[in-house]
Regions:
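Active-site beta-to-alpha loop of glycosyltransferases that engages the nucleotide-sugar donor
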Residues: 46-60, 77
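Acceptor/aglycone-binding surface of glycosyltransferases and processive sugar-polymer synthases
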Residues: 99-120, 127, 139-220, 247-257, ...
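A conserved acidic beta->alpha catalytic loop
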Residues: 75-84, 103, 135
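Short, acidic, metal-binding catalytic loop of nucleotide-sugar glycosyltransferases
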Residues: 60-70
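Short beta-strand/loop segment that forms part of the nucleotide-sugar
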Residues: 46, 69-78, 99-101
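Acidic helix N-cap motif at the loop->helix transition within catalytic regions
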Residues: 53-57, 80-89
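Hydrophobic helical membrane-anchoring modules
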Residues: 2-42, 57, 188-190, 214-272
Length: 272
């Protein structure tokens, strides 16, 4: 397998239309490792940075679900060799794509990059699932997300705060901060859901195509921006309960600057 260097293309250096230009798609397709002609009903986006302790187990469990899916790993040039683990997984599973970004660039850009890549494929999936790559999200919840999506919901959120949802191994402080953030966001965005910051979701590809040009977040505020854009379009949004388990291996990626970006985004919405 030929190993690609980190992609030199800045996918965020220009405004992109909902339908990516053929020249732009051709450029970054050269940076993707794997079979770009893969056909799948479901695309799974896994943003990674230093996840060698988790990525093999996670991908193996996703594959064991037996769903018609493909997996897109977007690695921010992890110094621990996460991309090499992904390459070894590609030898076992032909439905895995790897996109190596030149540096740590934030969750928001990873998700929008993943959206753009799936939209640009010859055979785009019908649903796109996002989830954390640190095993905080249980891959066994994916079928329930897909089932709800197939009932006609354009965005399905795995909620920690709806009935039967929950968290494990969280400190009281972390739980309080999360709930306050969700309350403030609810007052600002006003979608009829309980969990705005959950990263485990299923989007219809049609919804992603409609809103991709309006997604500009660089970090964790992408979770709110996508719900806001879906709500502005009067999309059908549903929640299913999930249990979020605090990561057992590796370190949390959330930084003070990303918290500041999150707060700034909420304030910017409130001023509009």
């Amino acid at each position: 397998m030929q190993i690609q260097a980190p992609c030199p293309i800045d996918m965020h250096s220009r405004e992109q239309q909902p339908q990516l230009s053929m020249s732009f798609a051709s450029d970054f397709h050269q940076c993707i490792e794997g079979d770009l002609a893969v056909k799948s009903q479901i695309g799974v986006i896994l943003p990674t940075y230093c996840e060698t302790a988790n990525i093999e187990k996670l991908v193996t469990e996703i594959e064991s679900l037996g769903l018609p899916l493909s997996i897109l790993i977007l690695d921010d040039s992890s110094p621990d060799g996460t991309a090499n683990v992904a390459r070894s997984l590609q030898k076992k599973h032909k439905n895995i794509l790897l996109f190596t970004r030149p540096k740590k660039s934030g969750l928001g850009t990873a998700i929008t990059d993943g959206f753009k890549i799936f939209l640009s494929l010859e055979f785009p999936p019908e649903q796109i699932v996002t989830m954390d790559a640190d095993y905080s999200h249980n891959p066994k919840e994916i079928p329930r997300l897909i089932e709800a999506s197939q009932e006609g919901y354009e965005l399905v959120v795995g909620s920690r705060y709806c009935q039967d949802g929950g968290t494990q191994d969280w400190s009281i402080m972390r739980l309080a901060i999360s709930k306050i953030a969700n309350l403030v966001t609810k007052l600002t965005v006003n979608a009829q859901i309980s969990d705005y910051t959950s990263g485990m979701r299923c989007y219809s590809t049609d919804l992603v195509r409609k809103m991709i040009k309006d997604l500009h977040s660089h970090t964790y505020e992408i979770q709110i921006e996508t719900i806001r854009q879906a709500n502005l379009r009067k999309s059908k949004i549903e929640e299913i309960p999930i249990t979020f388990v605090n990561r057992k291996k590796g370190r949390s990626k959330l930084s003070i600057n990303e918290i500041k970006d999150f707060v700034s985004y909420i304030l910017s919405i409130h001023r509009r």
